Amino acid sequence: MKLVLAIVLILMLVSLSTGAEESGQEISMVGPPLYIWDPIPPCKQLDEDCGYGYSCCEDLSCQPLIEPDTMEITALVCQIESA
């Protein structure tokens, strides 16, 4: 009985790990890449969408939400840039 339970658990773990890999590949292929190195045009309004991974700052410039070097979320980047 323990052997059957162990086999079932192993099969479940294998299916979960392969499922995660497949969904990760799908996510990476859908939508634009997070980092677009072309210059981002400034936004015209504060609530305007700058595109995926960017936010519009008070000075109407588009800034990345994630710092490429440290991969940390920089939601305060607008305040840092304008200070």
From Swiss-Prot:
It is found in: Secreted. GO terms for cellular component: extracellular region. Expressed by the venom duct. Residues 1-19 form the signal peptide. The keyword Signal applies. Keywords: Disulfide bond, Knottin, Secreted, Signal, Toxin. One of its GO terms (molecular function) is toxin activity. Residues 20-42 form a propeptide. It comes from the Eukaryota. Disulfide bonds join C43-C57, C50-C62, C56-C78. The presence of a 'disulfide through disulfide knot' structurally defines this protein as a knottin. The cysteine framework is VI/VII (C-C-CC-C-C). Belongs to the conotoxin I3 superfamily. This is Conotoxin Pu6.1. It comes from Conus pulicarius (Flea-bitten cone).
